[in-house]
Amino acid sequence: MSLRLEKFFGAWMHEYKPDYGSAETGLDRFVAYCKAAEFIGKSAALATREAGPERQLCAFVVAAEDTDVWGDEPIWIEDTVVGFVTSGGFAHYRHKSVALGFVPSDWARAGLEVEIEILGARRPATLVTEPLFDPAGVRMPA
């Protein structure tokens, strides 16, 4: 999955798993709520969509030193853990450490400064909304 982190693409059982709803992960646009057919969880998904998700999947550029995030690292705002990293690593195209993780929707805005704990040390990170590679999606493979 080359350039996955640079494109902010999630992966199954990391960003996309039964613990997270479609509104939280940004996959809501793929759910056909308008169809008459029922599916398990439709009423809950509709309620979350209408009320807005409690948390959102976000991308962070991390000021890592010699170790990158891997997954399950806490995301701190001041002295409070507000979320956890779902996956991350070194983005070779931009030469930056990138993390994907969930934070409360109220905090999910570009430029948010957080800290991500890596091996017991908190490292500064910035929430980014624009993919680091091909933000317009023009280089997507056919």
Question: Which residues does each predicted region cover?
Answer:
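Conserved, structured C-terminal
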Residues: 1-142
